[in-house]
Amino acid sequence: MKVLIINNRFYPINMIGAFRIEAFAKYFQQAGHSVTVVTDGEADEMKLWSGCNVYYVKDPLITLSYRERCVKEGKKWVLRRIANGLLVRLTADGKFIWRWKAYKKAASLCEANSFDVVLSSFDPLAPHIIAYKLRKNGYKFYWIADMRDEMSKSIFKSRYQVRSLIPYERKIVNSSDLVVSVSEPLLKDFKRFCKHDNFLEIKNGYDYEEIHDVYFQSQFTMAFFGHFHRKWVSPANWFKAFSELIKEGELPSDSQIKIIGNRFKLDVPQDIASNVLLIPPVVHSEAIRMSLEADTLVVIHTTGRKGVYTGKLFDYLATNKPILALCDPEDVIAGLLEETKAGFTVDNADIAGIKKMILRCYSIWKNKEVLPRDWEKIRQYTRKNQCKILLDYLANVQKLT
């Protein structure tokens, strides 16, 4: 089977969205299929990655490295970023210009290869539009629309962007042969626009060897990996609960919080400023190693956002460290932690509850306990096993047999 993957995030990008698509490419190739990738890059070039041909197409407007430099240097109002922001408002697609170049590359590859399957992934909109245009222009293939994030249901989008995305969402889910997403609640959202019933849940998963040996730090240490969002994801209640516990003498005064990878300014209470370590972003393999240097791994999930497993949650699963999730106790993260026995959930608005759960994690550290994880349940969430779900599904598709 010949497979074309169209996506904006791929190696060497250090992001969960890239890791998901890399897993599709890697495990499809290992299953004996020919895999070609068209993705965003710093230059127009072709490289070999894990046996896959990867065609990088440079965005004429703004590259990822340029955007990262602007964010790091606090350059918000530069011409290219302003133009990119206008594109998002006018077209609902910040990769509007890139997609014209990428379509030409994808079309030329279709002419040469006659792909059996095309997998496109959102966000941004561009990969789906390229796949849709390929189909409209007569290329025959089985189209998998990977919706790793919400489209019109996203709480991160403005009302104008939501209105702009709805017709695209309807067009994509109805034109594709299979819609894939990371959770059943998200699939349910996409079904409201769809005339067919071809939907499949493929979670993000983890892709490293599980770790059973547990090392306890000399001082109680909690860690958060990733970045916060000024409006939607805040550590304020975590900090407040932590601060109160230290004041009350319930936690040792030398207890630590490590924040690894956050790019936004944080308001750390002065009384715990010396307890909070801010560490710049690191590559994924280093993040996994650093997670072993914590006693509790923290998830803070977006207030009001339903049905989404934050990608770091799966990386946390195989570390054998307790996971503390500040999120909706009725949502999917809570269900996953209960199923795998890997940690605890508390509502992010419940300060008293957060304090109680921090103390529970502290007790585990103090008594050098290890949670009785259900490793069989956890192993189903390796990226390899999640990709196998899709491979098994495709093996039964009549169009491909």
PLM region spans:
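N-terminal subdomain of nucleotide-sugar transferases
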Residues: 1-62, 178, 187, 245, ...
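A conserved catalytic-core segment of Leloir-type glycosyltransferases
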Residues: 40-101, 109
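A charged, aromatic-enriched C-terminal amphipathic alpha-helix characteristic of glycosyltransferases
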Residues: 349-353, 363-396
